[in-house]
């Protein structure tokens, strides 16, 4: 056992088989929910647990650059939905033919249907001008915030809460709606609500948009392209 002169360490080891299975189940059955939300509101205690899980995420230099803007009012969500709809129409025009038709068939109603939305942001000034671990890779604060999103998503799966990540919008429009400062970046708009059914595989795979790549095609040994 490693020495611990400051008394800061605690015993560590593998989880029990049931605990491991629960962790992997959450990972493997997590889905991006687009339209299957139930109207039942989430309790404040549940929301606090999910945000607590997000706040436990690792961050570069312990920067903790995230903030969470909770959005529940219909008026605000409708403004965001209109911003999404404008961007979604623009996105549809970037595809053509059968691909465009399939894109337009994909429903994304979470902004309106989910009882809670969370705008997850990254304050790139937090921690000062020089942040440990970010000196040569300044984008690490954004990656850290994405870790918080993943933590929340997995915790939500364990709680029976669906999460949908909306990324089709002009950031400037959402910032204006929510009064987000210029130096803060939006990382994710998350729609949250209870679900009683989930797709057995990712929805985009189930609907023929794209399939999961074989893992063995993505793993290299000691260098790019080396297998």
Swiss-Prot record:
Describe activation and inhibition of this protein: Inhibited by high concentrations of FMN.
Protein name (record) = 5,6-dimethylbenzimidazole synthase
NCBIfam families from the UniProt entry: BluB
Which family does this protein fall into?
Answer: Belongs to the BluB family.
GO molecular function, a single term: oxidoreductase activity, acting on paired donors, with incorporation or reduction of molecular oxygen
Q: What happens without the gene?
A: Cells lacking this gene are unable to grow in minimal media and fails to establish a symbiosis with alfalfa, and these defects can be rescued by the addition of vitamin B12 (cyanocobalamin) or the lower ligand of cobalamin, 5,6-dimethylbenzimidazole (DMB).
Q: Which GO BP terms apply?
A: cobalamin biosynthetic process
| Annotated EC | 1.13.11.79
Q: Identify the residues that bind FMN.
A: 30-34, 59, 108, 167
| Keywords (A to Z) from UniProt | Cobalamin biosynthesis, Flavoprotein, FMN, NAD, NADP, Nucleotide-binding, Oxidoreductase
Q: How does it assemble?
A: Homooctamer.
Asked whether the UniProt record includes Cell membrane among its keywords, one would answer: no
What's its catalytic activity? FMNH2 + O2 = dialurate + 5,6-dimethylbenzimidazole + D-erythrose 4-phosphate + H(+)
Enzyme class label? oxidoreductase
Report the function annotation for this chain.
Involved in the biosynthesis of cobalamin (vitamin B12). Catalyzes the oxidative fragmentation and contraction of the isoalloxazine heterocycle and the cleavage of the ribityl tail of FMN(2) to form 5,6-dimethylbenzimidazole (DMB) and D-erythrose 4-phosphate (E4P). NAD(P)H is only required initially to reduce FMN and oxygen drives the oxidative fragmentation.
